[in-house]
Structure formats: structure tokens, C-alpha cells
Amino acid sequence: MFNEVHSIHGHTLLLITKPSLQATALLQHLKQSLAITGKLHNIQRSLDDISSGSIILLDMMEADKKLIHYWQDTLSRKNNNIKILLLNTPEDYPYRDIENWPHINGVFYAMEDQERVVNGLQGVLRGECYFTQKLASYLITHSGNYRYNSTESALLTHREKEILNKLRIGASN
């Protein structure tokens, strides 16, 4: 049944990292465990075409500041139902930097094993997010950038969005 659900949704896993045997092995393990199609992309190369419904797993161990800004900028221009998850994230990576990632749906820290990554990705495929409780709390209470991106919210006027944002932070009449 698990395989049937995900083949219907047509998600594709895109692992963005430095190509290596280890990265290829990880991708194969994830594809097999999740019954999902996937491909490896070199983090140093640009990427123009990202298919709708892609789940992007970006390896933070291979990203410097310049690459992080490049990928944030590139991915922020995509609004085709993509989900971004950070992989091998350093423990001390600031929450405020995590909230700058567009379409962020999960963060896997460097100390997490493959099974936790698989379980987290299974949740994301079911429509969930994968964050620590502490990070989720931060995103909910402090972030003006982290918003659920649905077609319904796109139908609101700018003023309606302003009012909702003020309500979110506790303002009243």
C-alpha cells in the first residue's frame, strides 16, 4: 500500500550534493526505501528545471555561504509545489538561517542516521514536515517568512495578508 500511495503522487527525490559513491549509495537506498524516483545533482552546478512535486534534499556539508545563497535564490523562484529538506545540517546552524530557506519542509542534522532520514522523508511524502520540536516552535512563533504555501493563500489580497500576519503575531483591534 505504501508503494501505491507514492507512485500515485508522482514525487521525485532530488539529492543535491557533491557526487560521490557515498551519495549514489544514499540515493539508491532512499529510492528503494521510499519507492520513489530520484536523481543526483552536483551542488556546484546550476539547475534550471525542477519538476513539480519534487522533494529536494540539499546536503549542507557540501555547501558554503556562496552556494547556500545561490540555492536559496534559485529555489525561491520556483513555485511548483516543491519541498526542500536540509541534509547533514550542522547542529549550530542558526534557526534564523533555516527560516530563510524557501519551501522548507524539514531539517536533518549531521548526527541523524539513514533510518531517521527515511522516516522523516516518509512523513514529508504524507504531507508532514520534519523539524525538531524546538525548531518547529521557533518557526511558528518567530518567523514571518515561514508560511504554508497553498493556492488558497495566493488568492488573498495584500491587505488581507497584512491583517492575517498582524493577527498571527497577536495584534487586535
Tell me the role of every PLM-derived stretch.
Residues 101-102, 145-147:
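Short glycine/proline- and charge-enriched loop/turn segments
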Residues 147-173:
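Helix-turn-helix DNA-binding segment
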Residues 1-138:
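N-terminal regulatory/sensing modules of transcriptional regulators
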Residues 140-142:
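Preference for well-ordered, secondary-structure-rich cores of eukaryotic proteins
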